[in-house]
Amino acid sequence: MLLLAWLITSVDATCNPEGFDPKNANLDMARWRVHANPPVDTARTNRAFGAYKFSASDGRETFPVAFGMVEGWPWPHRCDPAKYRRLHATVKFRNTDVAVASYPKTGTTWVEQIVLLLLHGADAKLDPASRNTYNARRNPLGCVWLEPMVASARRARMSLNQFADLPAPRVLKSHAPFDAFLGTRGSTDNASLANLRQTGLKVIYVARNPKDAAVSMYFQRAPLPGKRNNIKRRMPMDAWCALYTKGYVSCGAFVDHVARWHAVSKAVESPVLFVTYEELKQNPAKGVRKIADHLGLERSDEDINAVVKLSSFDAMAAQARKAPRPGDARNAKYATLTNGAVDAKSASSHLRQGGAGTWVQHFSPLLSKQFDAAYQSTMAVAAARLGGPPPAFDFGHGCVM
Ligand code: A3P
C-alpha cells in the first residue's frame, strides 16, 4: 500500500497532467521480455507481411504481433516487397503535390483534413470524408496513400497510371521513415533531401507526444483476445509499451522516425514543415496558418478560421458519424472492448479521444518513467547517428522530451 502511494505521488510532475487512473498503478514494463523472430538486423530486410513475429512475454503469458519487414521497417499493411520496390523506383511527383507524413497515430488524419480544406476552400459542402482517403467515386479529392494502394500484397486499389492521371493538386499520405519515403532514395539523408527537392513535393510532417501516440496505436492495433491471436485477455499496456519502445510495432521505432524527419525539416529552405499535434491543439489558427504559408497559399483570417472550425475534433467526429467506413465497426468494437473511450456511434478509431496528455489515464507512474528512459536513450542513439545533439520537443503541459 505504501509502495502504491509512493508510486502515485512520485508521478513525474513535468510530464503528467491530471487524470491518472489508479487501476493502472502496477503497470511495469520491466517484467516483459520482448522477442523478435527472426532477430531483426540493421540491414535492409524485405520480407512479406507476417514474416516477422514479435512478442512480449512475462514467462506466463505471451502477447504476439506480426509484421512484414519492407526496406527494414515493419509495414502497417499487407505489402508485397517487390511491388513496393517497383513503386519506389517508378513513382513520379509533381511540384503541385503535397504529402502529409507522420508516424502512425500522431494526427495524420487531422492534418490531411487541414490540407484538403486549405487547398479546396473551406466549404462545408466539400466535406472531405472523415478519414480523407482517396476514392474515385466517393472522395476524388481525398489523400492517396500510395504504399498500400499500389503495393498491397492482396490487391492494389490504384495503378501508377491512375495516380499519374489525377488532377493537381494531389495530396498524399505516408507513414514511411524519411529514408524509405517515396521519391527520396539516396545513399545519405542529404542525398535523399536533394532528391526530394527535385520532385518539388511539399511535405507536412506531424509529430505527437509519443505516449499519446503509443496509447492511440494501442487502441487501434494491439491484438484482440480470441483464438486468432491465441490470447485470453487484451494485451496490457506495459507489454504494449515494451514492444512499442523497441520499435516492434507498425512503422518501427517512433524515435528514429521523428528524429530523422525533424533533422530534414531543419535544413535551409526545407520542403518539409515539422508541426506537432500539441501546437495545433493549443493554437489551431496559428498551426493552420503555418501550414498554409508552407504550401504558399495566401489565405484570409476568415478562411483560416473556417478551416479551423471544419477540422476541429467535433466537426470531424460528426462527419465520421455520418459516413462510417469499412473497418470502423471493427475499430469501434475493439476500442469499446479495450475501454478506449471511443464514441461507439462515431465508430472511428481515427477519431477516438483527440486529447493531448491523455496517456496519463493509461500509464502507471513507473511505466511513464520507464517509457521516458527508453525514449531518451533511443533518442540519444538516433541523434548521434544523425550527428547532432538530441532534439527536444515541446509536447505541451510542460512536457519537453
Ligand atoms: P486518439 O486515439 O488519441 O484519440 P492518425 O490520424 O495519425 O491515425 O491519428 C489519430 C489520432 O488523432 C487519434 O488520437 C484521433 O482522435 C486524433 N485526431 C484526429 N482528428 C483530430 C482532430 N481534429 N483534433 C484532435 N485530434 C484528432
Which residues does each PLM region occupy?
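Short amphipathic alpha-helical segments at helix boundaries and their inter-helical linkers
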Residues: 312-326, 381-387
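Conserved C-terminal subdomain of P-loop nucleotide-binding cores
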Residues: 211, 221, 237, 288-299, ...
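Short, conserved secondary-structure transition motifs
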Residues: 144-151, 310-319
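Amphipathic alpha-helical surface "interface" segments used
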Residues: 308-314, 329-335, 388-401
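PAPS-dependent sulfotransferase catalytic domain
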Residues: 14-275, 343-400
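Cleavable N-terminal signal peptides of Sec/SRP-targeted secreted and luminal proteins
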Residues: 1-13
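Mobile gating loops/cap/lid regions near enzyme active sites that modulate substrate access
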Residues: 319-343
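PAPS/PAP-binding and catalytic site of the sulfotransferase fold
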Residues: 107-121, 274-299, 307, 315, ...
